[in-house]
């Protein structure tokens, strides 16, 4: 049964078609794996075993009748940010206690329409605010990876830490995730999984709990590049319920895998060589450059001059949007309600008890930068910086660059309750230093495993592409995947 959970989505599809096992047997194997591992890893907050069995039986019926859909019988984990009809959805926040939506998010609707099976809801940073999955009301997720010879619990990254940990520990065949400033790509890099943040507007945001509406984008975390391509094809769509989703055809991403990269121009931005970057990250980046060169790509040095302003601008724009989006949680119609003497006190009590420390910090920052005396000085200036960042990328692509290669993170995974990180929020925010520019510009970015550090922990590389050109990212990421090889954690859970 263990071997079934190690299959990739492409392998699952082939073996289900050949009747080597049933969708129900596969689902039972995953449910058994979750039961064994979840107490230690804390990746799932809700396991929908009965629903999963029901969906798997329906898939078996279709497989028997010869009407298999693209994800028929494939068991997936769903980040707790996606509304799932009748299934507890609370963005891992106390303030949404016992909330069961009466509707389904567009992304999950698309996945179920393609035959996928829901195993349950995955842990995450509260309201997707965090880079370590330590802000969840349900407690931290534990990374399946450990230092060579060590037994210290490490973070899986965030905010999609549950998604990355579940995929890496073989607790689902793939997972949905979201990325506002790096929340797909950083956890993927920390767990040796593949994560793609598609172009803003590629996937509908309808039914996804909002953090920062102009930055949020859904995407998959998967075992390999091919699986990520398969999942994104099903997740992506135009949606009349989300006016920011773009009405352009969704290509067959899987077809891009294996295509030659000969003649492609890969840009190397000098601004990503940040001060204090570990030598191992620098060496891995050079290795990635050589792999692309060996595959026939042309390497060109480029400049993205406004990169250094991206992180401070992001931490103005994102909290500003969050403070507005999170104003709707007041204890009146759903979720946690803490009584007070009057309605104002009830609002105050509910929000004080319901939101965690990091969420409160960001709401306060956002409210501050939007306030009358500071709006021009902070928020408008940050939006101008955002325009300049977008223009930097446009100029690079106009000059003929096809994709940009950078490190995915400034370090490997760090320890849970790391004192340095907890003492200084800015140090935690620096985890997003290589990823936020992509969200600010609305571009696609993919993180792919590329090696291990001296302690045996995974490191990833990031590829950034033109808007709506995810195909080139899958094509180039596959080259890195082929050159670097596969990385799996040693089972300790």
UniProtKB/Swiss-Prot annotation:
First and last residue of the signal peptide: none
EC number: 6.3.5.7
UniProt source species: Chelativorans sp. (strain BNC1)
Family from the record: Belongs to the amidase family. GatA subfamily.
Active-site positions on this chain: 79, 159, 183
GO biological process: translation
UniProt-recorded name of the protein: Glutamyl-tRNA(Gln) amidotransferase subunit A
Lineage summary: Bacteria, Pseudomonadati, Pseudomonadota, Alphaproteobacteria, Hyphomicrobiales
Pfam families, alphabetized: Amidase
Job of this protein: Allows the formation of correctly charged Gln-tRNA(Gln) through the transamidation of misacylated Glu-tRNA(Gln) in organisms which lack glutaminyl-tRNA synthetase. The reaction takes place in the presence of glutamine and ATP through an activated gamma-phospho-Glu-tRNA(Gln).
């Amino acid at each position: 049964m263990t071997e079934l959970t190690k299959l990739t989505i492409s392998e699952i599809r082939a073996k289900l078609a050949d009747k080597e096992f049933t969708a129900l047997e596969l689902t039972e194997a995953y449910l058994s794996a979750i039961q064994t591992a979840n107490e230690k890893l804390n990746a799932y907050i809700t396991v929908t075993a009965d629903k999963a069995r029901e969906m798997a039986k329906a898939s078996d019926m279709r497989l028997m009748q010869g009407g298999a859909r693209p994800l028929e019988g494939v068991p997936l984990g769903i980040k707790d940010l996606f509304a799932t009809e009748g299934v507890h959805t609370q963005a891992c926040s106390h303030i949404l206690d016992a909330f069961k939506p009466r509707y389904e998010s567009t992304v999950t609707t698309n996945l179920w329409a393609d035959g996928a099976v829901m195993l349950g809801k995955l842990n995450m940073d509260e309201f997707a605010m965090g880079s370590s999955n330590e802000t969840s009301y349900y407690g931290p997720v534990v990374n399946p990876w450990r230092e060579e010879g060590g037994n210290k619990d490490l973070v899986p990254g965030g905010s999609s830490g549950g998604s990355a940990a579940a995929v890496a520990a073989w607790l689902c065949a793939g997972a949905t995730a979201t990325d506002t400033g790096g929340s797909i790509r950083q956890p993927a890099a920390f767990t040796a999984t593949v994560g793609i943040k598609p172009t803003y507007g590629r996937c509908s945001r309808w039914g996804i709990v909002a953090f920062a509406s102009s930055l949020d984008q859904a995407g998959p975390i998967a075992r390999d590049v091919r699986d990520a391509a398969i999942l994104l094809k099903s997740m992506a769509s135009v949606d009349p319920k989300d006016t920011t989703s773009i009405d352009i055809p969704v290509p067959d991403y899987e077809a891009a895998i294996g295509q030659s990269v000969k003649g492609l121009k890969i840009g190397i931005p000098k601004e990503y060589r940040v001060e204090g970057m570990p030598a191992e990250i620098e060496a891995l980046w050079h290795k990635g450059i050589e792999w692309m060169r060996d595959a026939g790509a042309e390497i060109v040095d480029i400049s993205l001059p406004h990169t250094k302003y991206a992180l401070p601008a992001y931490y103005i724009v994102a909290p500003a949007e969050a403070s507005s989006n999170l104003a709707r949680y007041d204890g009146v119609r759903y979720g946690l309600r803490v009584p007070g003497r009057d309605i104002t006190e009830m609002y105050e009590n509910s929000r004080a008890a319901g939101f965690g420390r990091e969420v409160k910090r960001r709401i306060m920052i956002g409210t501050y930068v939007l306030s009358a005396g500071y709006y021009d000085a902070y928020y408008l200036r940050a939006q101008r910086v955002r325009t300049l960042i977008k223009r930097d990328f446009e100029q690079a692509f106009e000059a003929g660059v096809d994709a940009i290669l950078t490190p995915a993170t400034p370090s490997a995974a760090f320890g849970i309750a790391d004192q340095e990180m907890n003492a200084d929020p800015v140090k935690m925010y620096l985890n997003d230093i290589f990823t936020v520019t992509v969200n600010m510009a609305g571009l696609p970015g993919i993180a792919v495993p590329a090696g291990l550090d001296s302690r045996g922990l995974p490191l990833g590389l990031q590829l950034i592409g033109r808007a709506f050109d995810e195909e080139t990212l899958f094509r180039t990421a596959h080259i890195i995947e082929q050159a670097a090889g596969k990385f799996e954690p040693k089972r300790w859970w």
